[in-house]
Regions:
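Anionic coordination/interaction segments
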Residues: 1-195
Length: 195
């Protein structure tokens, strides 16, 4: 999700889950997809690809300000953990935590007999991030991905642990300057990585 921090308007850089008002251009290739979109003076390009030599999925977001004024935005990445064959069967066993040194969100399912020692992660390289491991909190009561309750809050709560409806959400606020073709490649600061 991308959100204008001044107006509260939000949209996703891909057609789902929260389609913006403008058109989307989607390109697919061997092992990757690229989504381009322009919304209210903000140009975004989301490149999703998988590593050739490991079980890692990357989402690299490039954001550019073409609005003619400075903008304060936030980018929010969201995934729902499965860690097994079917989410309804595994969700009650998934435990989330935040790794102390890196701040990455981790998830594990020790009850998965096929891979009990595997750990999934979701991370971004930006210290101003906020996180949540609680899907119910992120979506809200009777919430939906096209309009999650978290998009109405300033920050994510930081709630992680056991006995939650598990997810991983990371939100990063950032500023884009005006009239300089200024952009931000959220690749180091916001390469969402899921394994």
């Amino acid at each position: 999700y991308l959100r204008d921090e001044e107006s509260g308007q939000f949209w996703s850089p891909s057609p789902l889950p929260a389609r913006g008002t403008g058109a989307y251009v989607t390109r697919h290739g061997f092992g990757y997809s690229v989504f381009e979109h322009h919304e209210d003076g903000i140009s975004s390009e989301l490149c999703v690809y998988v590593a050739m030599d490991s079980a890692v999925k990357f989402s690299v977001l490039k954001v550019r300000n073409i609005s003619g004024r400075s903008r304060r935005l936030s980018a929010t990445g969201y995934v729902e953990w499965v860690l097994g064959d079917l989410r309804p069967k595994t969700a009650m066993h998934v435990i989330t935590e935040m790794e102390g040194k890196s701040g990455a969100l981790l998830a594990r399912n020790s009850y998965n007999t096929e891979v009990p020692d595997r750990i999934a992660f979701f991370d971004v390289d930006d210290p101003s991030r906020s996180v949540s491991g609680d899907r119910t909190e992120f979506l809200g009561r009777n919430g939906a991905l096209h309009h999650p309750a978290a998009m109405g809050r300033t920050r994510l709560s930081g709630k992680v642990g056991a006995a939650l409806d598990p997810c991983a959400a990371i939100q990063v606020p950032f500023d884009l300057l005006r009239d300089r073709g200024h952009g931000r490649l959220l690749d180091g600061p916001f390469a969402l990585t899921v394994a």
